[in-house]
Amino acid sequence: NAGCTRGQMVTFLWRANGSPEPKSMTTSFTDVKSGAYYEKAVAWAVENNVTTGTSSTTFSPDASVTRAQAVTFQWRAAGAPAAEGTNAFADVSASAFYAPAVQWAVNAGVTTGTSDTTFSPNSNCLRAQIVSFLYRAAK
């Protein structure tokens, strides 16, 4: 149950989408080095509005990816479809940037949360959880 970084998450997502060549390798992120294993994945993620980074100049590829970030990346990669229904998680505010992504993930059967009433958005997402999210979304 190893943790997962933001760089690994976008790489998994990029590969799950067929590893498409990005139109441009240029991003504003100074922490995405040329030749890094995740460079193409990050460029693809930026082009497809999957991520805007942790700031205008950083992606933070080595930072742990949170559950909120993981489902948001996945939701955006799916085209940010409308999320219907009512949020059942006490720890997901309706105004949180990730709220529609969490609702989509629940509706799509990607995740059920960490309990009936919690999603744990700020908890680090484990590699096993991410693989499960990707598998369930592909079904």
Residue spans for each PLM region:
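Feature responds to low-complexity, polar/acidic, surface-exposed segments characteristic
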Residues: 1-10, 15-40, 51-68, 76-100, ...
